[in-house]
Amino acid sequence: MKVAVLGAAGGIGQALALLLKTQLPSGSELSLYDIAPVTPGVAVDLSHIPTAVKIKGFSGEDATPALEGADVVLISAGVARKPGMDRSDLFNVNAGIVKNLVQQVAKTCPKACIGIITNPVNTTVAIAAEVLKKAGVYDKNKLFGVTTLDIIRSNTFVAELKGKQPGEVEVPVIGGHSGVTILPLLSQVLGVSFTEQEVADLTKRIQNAGTEVVEAKAGGGSATLSMGQAAARFGLSLVRALQGEQGVVECAYVEGDGQYARFFSQPLLLGKSGVEERKSIGTLSAFEQNALEGMLDTLKKDIALGEEFVNK
């Protein structure tokens, strides 16, 4: 199994590469690419870690050598959020970066599963889909927006509030990956109950957690380490499913049946060819139903922005 990380010299990319080097199954290959000249050195640095994962780094304009034979491509390239910016302020720079990289994926490893980490995910996934469609290689079961950070944050915050072990809590998060489009389904968390106030406060904290990190880093970056962990969890789940492990479920932002929006984050059963089954979002509480209806306009606008960027 070969995994390529594009944007591997950045804060998320380096954290992700470290976790993959230590956790990918023995015999895997890890390929690191970034425009930054330091990238081959990041690979050399990681190559000294004693795990049976081969690693190689590539830099420059052309990602082709890094992508050859890749089964999974994780894209974290782009600029990070600064205080006062929201994820959509990143659009102008990151849209072009994602478009360019996905064009290279379409050419070099069109059958790979692609995980988009670069924000704004609501929009960059739509860009990736349109680029792949134009190239005639789009498979909606193989393109994912990585929203796992919303899930791990939800698990952490719920566990803290309720005095549970974080590993015991799994919160499904649906919708999108910014602001009001992030909807944790707290009513579906097993063995835990919340007051209405707790639900309102937790939902808001989960939606604004990225901003919490941006402000705490005081202009020195955004959530890179927790995002690296989240992306590694998703990437490793995908690898396990591609290798035939049964019953691997993760939430991610994918093209579904369009019931709510063209792209929507929901629980997915992963399998040998990417998404095996888009699982139902289940029964929502009145609060969740209301939040779902209230976010769809924002989500649809985010998606349209990405579609127009490619097709203008």
Swiss-Prot record:
Q: Where does NAD(+) bind?
A: G7, A8, A9, G10, G11, I12, G13, D34, N94, I117, T118, N119, M227
Any one cellular-component term (Gene Ontology)? cytoplasm
An individual GO BP term: malate metabolic process
**What residues does substrate bind to?**
R81, R87, N119, R153
A single Pfam family, by name? Answer: Ldh_1_N
Could you state a single Gene Ontology molecular function term?
A: L-malate dehydrogenase (NAD+) activity
Key words of the record: NAD, Oxidoreductase, Tricarboxylic acid cycle
Active-site residues are H177
Under CDD domains, the record lists:
MDH_glyoxysomal_mitochondrial
Q: Which reaction does this chain catalyze?
A: (S)-malate + NAD(+) = oxaloacetate + NADH + H(+)
User: What EC number is given for this enzyme?
Assistant: 1.1.1.37
Group of enzyme by EC: oxidoreductase
Per its UniProt record, what PANTHER family does this chain match?
MALATE AND LACTATE DEHYDROGENASE (PTHR11540), MALATE DEHYDROGENASE, MITOCHONDRIAL (PTHR11540:SF16)
Task: Outline what the protein does.
Answer: Catalyzes the reversible oxidation of malate to oxaloacetate.
Q: Which NCBIfam families match?
A: MDH_euk_gproteo
Q: Which family does it belong to?
A: Belongs to the LDH/MDH superfamily. MDH type 1 family.
Subunit text: Homodimer.
> HAMAP family this protein is in?
Malate_dehydrog_1
Protein name (Swiss-Prot/TrEMBL):
Malate dehydrogenase
Source organism per UniProt: Shigella dysenteriae serotype 1 (strain Sd197)
